[in-house]
Amino acid sequence: MKATSLLTGWTCRHLGDTAPGKPVTLPHDAMLAEPRTALSAGGTNTGWYEGYDYEYQRTLTVPENELADTHILEFEGVYHNAEVWLNGQKAAFRPYGYTNFYVDCAPYLHAGENELRVIARNADQPNSRWYSGAGIYRPVQLWKARGAHITLNGVKIRTLSLQPAIVEVRVKTTAPGTVRLTVDDLPAMQQESDGEAVFTLTLDNARLWTPETPNLYTCRVSFADDEVTETFGVRKVEWGTDGFLLNGKRYIIQGACIHHDNGLLGAVCDPDAVARKVRLLKENGYNAIRSAHNPCSKALLTECDRQGVLVMDEYIDHWYIHKTEHDYVDYFNDWWRQDLTDMVEKDYNHPCVVLYSTGNEVSETAQKRGIALTKEMTDFLHGLDDSRPVTCGVNIFFNFLSSIGFGVYSDEKAKKEAERAEKAKQRGEKAAKKKAVGSQFFNNLAGLLGDEFMKRGATLHGCDVKTRDAFANMDIAGYNYGIYRYKHDLKKYPQRLILGSETFCNDAYKFRELAKQEPRLVGDFVWAGMDYLGEVMVGSWEYADYAETFDGGLGWVSAGSGRIDLTGKPLGEALYTRVALEADNGPYIAVCPVNHTGDRHSPSAWKMTNAMPSWSWTGCEGRKANVEVYARAARVELVLNGHTVGSKTLKNDCLARFSIPYESGTLEAVSYDAADHEIGRCKLQSAGGATRLTLDAEEPTVKPGHLCYIRLRYTDENGITKPLARGSIQVQVRGGTLVGLGSACPFNKHSYLDSETDTYYGEALAIVRMGDGDAMTIAASDGEYSAELTVSAQA
């Protein structure tokens, strides 16, 4: 079948509005344009964005001679409770907001213009623990075929063996006939189909797919007048007591959890934004991504295939116990099989997908019903695809706490809270803070008591009792925050494979060292790889000069949990994990904000450090500076302006901390091996006196219609950032469109759709969609600084 993108020609309005809708281009996040108010029912979950229902409209033109053709609409993601209407008739309903789904248009079309309406609900707040976005936030395609054709998702490709490399290609057709197939490096072949044709291909000297060598092959299948092109990788996944094997060799998964949003763009699933996110994560030492906590986009799979990043695709954040009042629980039982089927259909041909996860922190796994459901879902996935293992992210300590009544959702309590909130809204008052349940309860507890308490709590005997039966019903046991159980459980359960499905940043070194010794410890996913909208303040260490309150109230917009910040800048924690996971040996230097040494900040268990790679702290001369050096070495030395100011031996760690008086100039870290030979060196240089506004594009040329990321920085004349320079920047664009503007600050009262933003530690980010030619970005700051940058259009 042939696909036509339906990204333009749409309008969007609030459902029930009588005024014409505004023109929009898909993918589109309607929630990002809504106000953020203290009356938002989504509150801290959504970053205080208001929730509404939306109606999208466009026309589909079908010529008379095509009316008998097959027409199938594909929606890659509509949040949520999507209704699809064609010519006034309801053609489809799909409640889950994160799955792709298909609509057979045949019963509803007529020749000429057809009215297509899509309704997306999001007024039913709260319905998510994080910022979901709303509307048609992923692409839409119209699939068409005339006569006999290859069925949608009808080409399935699987590696059967590696020596020799044998690949199976299954092709489903709507009628008998001849199927023709070509694959790179092989002669063309054909086979008769009675509805399905099965090809077995032998590839001599096959180029294997791995994260280090992401080799891809192209497979072209033709049948009658139809043609399908698929890419695939020759790779095989195995799991057992030897651990997780990729192409027959043990492979340690070193991953990062990410949410689906793209920072300043909201939930918009733009291929350029997705490619950038994957690139940033891989550059910072991660070889895998966990799609938390919902099925990932097709764009993410394409990029992970291309760039070489493993994927754990995850289904959902809850099963039959609510975590928010209006989440997916009411639909789960009727829809989970179809949802999983569509997830596997999406993932099947992608070599990057190596794990399926049935859920996240589902305390149902502590109950008899949930234990049985764990097995049912695992078996169901095996029936769809037995080439990949199945896991589930279980919060070990929370399973125990929920079993004794802590943090459990109650419909009655939720109803009373909703009634109180509605009355407060009618009075124009802020509603009382909701009682946290489920994962939010655990997050709040961790924020109060710290990560060490939560990890120690997971070692209680009751935690084992309330997880062991569910773990027995999955291929790999997913431990959220259970690192202190690893050694004990590997010994107690000699057949169990363990995955750190969600972990604290400061455990990266411990994990890596233990995983090298224990094959059945297969991997780790840190929370979180990149910051995300919603679930505000959960991972933030923020100071009073940037955050008005430490209670997560209005103004807070992001979690602050990323090792990479909301604008895509790697922080000190990213440098630490690069070294801890042995992506390289360092050394790297990061410095805690010297102007805030000793100051109180917002609490979080998910923050290991707020250090950043800067030695430009104007006005802080003589003040104590907390310096961190990350290195795989026997010893590190700290040198300031040519004088050694500290030396530390590294034992069972890759982090050395120093406290020294701040003095501008050159700060160097030197690493040494056990024989005291220098093996690495890095330095930070203080910025000079004069300040200017500097604009830097991440790419020198960008294709028309694609995204250009432009960093706005206060710098000296040499381009060194000044983190203590602070101001407001106004941005104009000629020859393109400003689609996102903001800073990484988790507390931000501006809209990312504004043309003005405050800086955060001297920086902000503008995202520009290129027009047909060159694009000029003009920035001005507080009437004092100005700069412009022209980005050339790529031919």
Model region roles, listed by residue range:
Residues 3-17, 30, 46, 51-151, ...:
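Accessory beta-strand-rich segments of carbohydrate-active enzymes
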Residues 5, 11-18, 78, 125, ...:
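Substrate-binding clefts and catalytic carboxylate motifs of secreted carbohydrate-active enzymes
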Residues 35-62, 66-75, 79-86, 92-95, ...:
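Active-site-adjacent substrate/metal-binding segments within catalytic domains
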Residues 66-69, 109-113, 127, 203-216, ...:
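Short glycine/proline/serine/threonine-rich loop/turn segments at secondary-structure transition edges
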Residues 110-111, 170-239, 657, 661-664, ...:
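Extended acidic/polar, glycine-enriched regions
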Residues 164-191, 197-199, 625-644, 666-671, ...:
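Beta-strand-rich binding/interaction modules
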Residues 178-179, 212-216, 624-626, 632-634, ...:
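Short flexible loop/turn segments that cap and initiate beta-strands
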Residues 227-232, 676-688, 785-794:
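Edge beta-strands of extracellular beta-sandwich domains
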